[in-house]
């Protein structure tokens, strides 16, 4: 009997791996975890044989993993140089770590994105805001996740106060995006999930009290204003924050499938909001995607992201 290849899970957040571990053990998959931050590596050696799955997250530095960018890029490059099978490799890592790159790639493929001005250096934020000159606007760090550092700016005076009081969160690469806040008639954003390059399901996320978004069971949060959308109406507290759409936009899913394949992205969640004209505006690509078990259980779709 032919030996099964061992799976290697490359990550920097133990908490997010809990459901993946359960799924791997359920299917009797032999696996090993590589937690990447500070490290040493002998690049003259060959890596082990196996399948390598990168679960690196752009929010790594918010957990004080300050060297995850460098270590993950080195490890994935080393693996690819030895022709190992890597899921979400170095090309995808660049996309995960840069919201500017995400916006550029989406625009290049014809997807609508928010009006955006990029500021490199905190001293350029006010100039970028003046150039955008659309209020309210959103400021977010180029590398980020779970809404870290995303803030709403209603006026230029409000921005002045934020800068004066050091209320703009630092960015790992000293780069920020200033984006228009999209007007919408919807009470939710949409996140389309893809695994193996295939569309799995579409998740509606109702926002309440935060810019944070993490659909995983490990980080159930209240949501509001976390993406570049206008203020929306409160929803009934009895409704779940996350639920799976029984009637997803299949044409849009097909377009995104082509886009992800073009950029070698095998696992991802892509987020958008529809403006008042019903046009989807894309603002985020999550290549370290997680899944909400409660939403999956309550859905008629009968699909489990981890399995």
Model-predicted regions and their roles:
Residues 137, 200-201, 268, 281-283:
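Protein kinase-like catalytic core scaffold
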Residues 57-60, 142-144, 288:
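Short glycine-rich anion-binding loops that position phosphate/pyrophosphate groups of nucleotides
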Residues 243-251, 260-265, 274-307:
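C-terminal active-site "lid" helix and adjoining low-complexity regulatory extension at the edge
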Residues 151-260:
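Phosphate-binding site of ATP-dependent enzymes
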Residues 101-155:
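Hydrophobic alpha-helical segments and helix pairs
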Residues 51-55, 138, 177:
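Structural motif
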Residues 12-118, 127:
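Conserved N-proximal alpha/beta basic substrate-recognition cap immediately N-terminal to
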């Amino acid at each position: 009997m032919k030996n099964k290849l061992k799976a290697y899970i490359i990550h920097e957040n133990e908490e997010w791996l809990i459901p993946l571990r359960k799924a791997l053990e359920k299917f009797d998959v032999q696996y090993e975890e590589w937690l990447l931050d500070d490290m040493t590596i002998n690049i003259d050696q060959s890596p082990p044989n196996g399948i390598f799955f990168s679960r690196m997250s752009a929010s790594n530095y918010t957990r004080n993993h300050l060297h995850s960018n460098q270590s993950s890029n080195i490890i994935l490059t080393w693996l690819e140089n030895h022709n190992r099978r890597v899921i979400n490799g170095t090309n995808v890592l660049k996309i995960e770590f840069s919201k500017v790159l995400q916006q550029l790639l989406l625009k290049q493929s014809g997807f609508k994105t928010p009006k955006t001005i990029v500021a490199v250096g905190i001293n350029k934020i006010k100039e970028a805001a003046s150039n955008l000159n659309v209020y309210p606007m959103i400021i977010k760090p180029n590398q980020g996740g779970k809404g870290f550092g995303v803030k709403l700016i209603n006026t230029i005076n409000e921005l002045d106060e934020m800068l004066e009081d050091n209320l703009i969160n630092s960015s790992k690469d000293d780069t920020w995006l200033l984006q228009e806040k999209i007007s919408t008639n919807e009470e939710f954003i949409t996140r389309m999930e893809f695994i193996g390059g295939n569309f799995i399901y579409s998740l509606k996320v109702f926002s309440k009290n935060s810019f944070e978004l993490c659909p995983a069971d490990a980080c159930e949060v209240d949501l509001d204003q976390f993406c570049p959308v206008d203020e929306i109406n409160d929803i009934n507290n009895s409704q779940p924050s996350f639920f799976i759409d029984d009637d997803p936009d299949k044409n849009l899913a097909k377009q995104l499938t082509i886009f992800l394949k073009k950029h070698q992205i095998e696992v991802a969640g892509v987020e958008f909001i529809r403006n008042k004209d019903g046009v989807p505006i894309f603002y985020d690509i999550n290549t370290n995607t997680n899944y909400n078990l409660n939403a999956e259980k309550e859905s008629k779709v009968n699909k489990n992201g981890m399995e």
